[in-house]
C-alpha cells in the first residue's frame, strides 16, 4: 500500500511542477490595469507566462468576489478557450447589481490540461446609477453669468463688435477658479478606534467626482488620485466623465473635510490671451458623491448640495490655451482641513446640469510620469534680459508656437 502511495505521488509530481511554472500576470479590466469603473459586466484580460516553449492556454476559470467581504458572487467554471483578452463575463450581470468594489482572479489550463495556480486579485467597480440625485453646484448660474452660447466663437468671428460686446458682458465670477469645501461627520475608519456612539465600522468608502472643466480633489488636506487633468475632456453636450476614488483609508473618525479646487479647462474657455477658440458650456461646476458603507450593512451618502461653501482660489486667471496666473497672497492655509474658519466663505448656488450623459471615465488619467531637476542655466549672450525697476510689472503671454529659441526680447 505504501509503495502505491509513493508511485501515485511520483506520477502527480510532474503535473504539480508544470502548474507552478505557469504564472498569470498583467490582469486588466477593459484593457486597463488597476481599479476600473464599468457600467456593465466587465471584459477581463491576463497574460500567461511560462519558461517552457510552446506552453499555451486551453481553458480558463474566472472568479468574482465582493472585495470587502470576500464572498464569491460569480464563477465562470472551466471554459474551454484560448482567449485571454477582453474575455466577457457573461451572466455576471445577475450577480453584479450593487455599486461595490469587486475583486477577481483567474486560473488557466495548459495544453496538457494542467491547471495553473490562481492569479493575484485585481479590482473593478460597478458604476453607480444614483449620481443623478446629486446637485451641480458652483459660484454662479449660467443665467446670471451671461455667458454667450454656441460654438461659433473662433477666428474672425471674435473680432465682430457684437461678439466682443457679448463676451465683455460676462460676469467675472463666471471666469474664476474657486475652492469648494464641505465638512461632515462619520464613524471610525477601517480598523481601530471604533465609534463609541454607533459602534459601526467603515468597510468601504467611495467618492464619485465630476468637476468641470478640471478639478483637484482633496480629503482632509491630502490630494486624492494622481491625475493632473481630471476629468478627461469631451464634447460636454454629449458625454460628461466622472472619476471614482476609494477613500476608505483616508477617512477619519469624527469630522472630515472635502476640498475641491475647480477651474475652467475646456468646459469654459475664456480667451483673453492666445486661444484657438472661445466657447463656454457654462461656469465651473461640481457634482460630488461620497458613499460610505458600514459593517452592519447600512450606508450614508455625502452629496454636492447647498451645504457646501466656496471662495475664490489663488488662481486669478485660468484658460486652457492662455495658461494661469497665481497670486500666492490669496492662499488660505488649511482651507481643505478640519478646523479652518470658513465663516467668510459664501454659500454655493445650484447650477444647471451639463447636457451630456454622465459616464465613468474609463481611459487612463493624464498624470506626471517623471520629474526633472534643473541641471544648468546658461546665459546665451550679454544682452540684458529685462530692464525694470522694483515693483515694475512685465507680462509674458504663453503661446503654443516658439518663434525665438534664444532670449525673449521685451
Outline where the language-model segments fall.
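Pro/Thr/Ser/Gly-rich low-complexity, intrinsically disordered linker/stalk tracts
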Residues: 20-52, 125-127
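Activation corresponds to long, low-complexity, non-globular regions
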Residues: 146-154, 300-401
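Sec-dependent N-terminal signal peptides
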Residues: 6-14
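Low-complexity, Pro/Ser/Thr- and charge-rich linker/hinge segments at domain boundaries
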Residues: 126-150, 280-291, 300-302, 368-372
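Structural beta-strand segments of beta-rich domains
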Residues: 40-44, 203-205, 399-401
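Conserved small/polar residues in nucleotide/adenosyl-binding loops
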Residues: 408-410
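Recognizes extended acidic, P/S/T-rich segments that occur
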Residues: 56-101, 111-117, 136-141
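Accessory beta-strand-rich segments of carbohydrate-active enzymes
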Residues: 46, 81, 85-88, 101-105, ...
